[in-house]
């Protein structure tokens, strides 16, 4: 079978250097949303490595674009921080702890928990709510890999309780997150949405 040869420029285009990774673009410069509100929904620092050129909650800043339905990023969370419950309906989300430790909350109300230490992995199937928090005494670092159909990256919903937490913290902020394509309907019967 014939193989493909890559030029030096093509190799450079498909290479990501950790030192050059940029924070996700969707919320980076949004001054209408407090850091505390961002911290409820996202890891404090998300650095996309690989993205598809489709609508997704991470924006359009990545080192590499297009990898056959794969999204990959590095998340850094300070102690006690991490994104709350959310659900990817069409994609698998797999987490690998690079440094520190995280506690994952799984289920519509986070009723199940699993702690991951350095080098541990949790793979969450589509349709399951999950959130996580850094339970270490210093920054923890997570590699996240999302797989599934390339056109299914805009598949994230959050439980109503997340909307309530946001509104209690910063009234009127929900439209900023809804503009990213996030809906606060996870766990609701489709007839009630």
For the regions a protein language model found, what residue spans apply to each?
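Glycine- and acidic-residue-biased ligand/ion/polar-headgroup-sensing regions
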Residues: 90-103
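Short acidic-glycine-tyrosine-enriched beta hairpin
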Residues: 108-126
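Double-stranded beta-helix
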Residues: 2-9, 131-193
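Conserved short histidine dyad/triad with adjacent acidic residue
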Residues: 53-60, 71-88
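A short, N-terminal "cap"/entry segment at the start of jelly-roll beta-barrel domains
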Residues: 1-69, 172-193
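Short histidine-centered beta-strand/loop micro-motifs
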Residues: 61-66, 83-89, 106, 113-115, ...
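Histidine-centered metal-chelating micro-motifs
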Residues: 82-84, 103, 120-122, 126-132
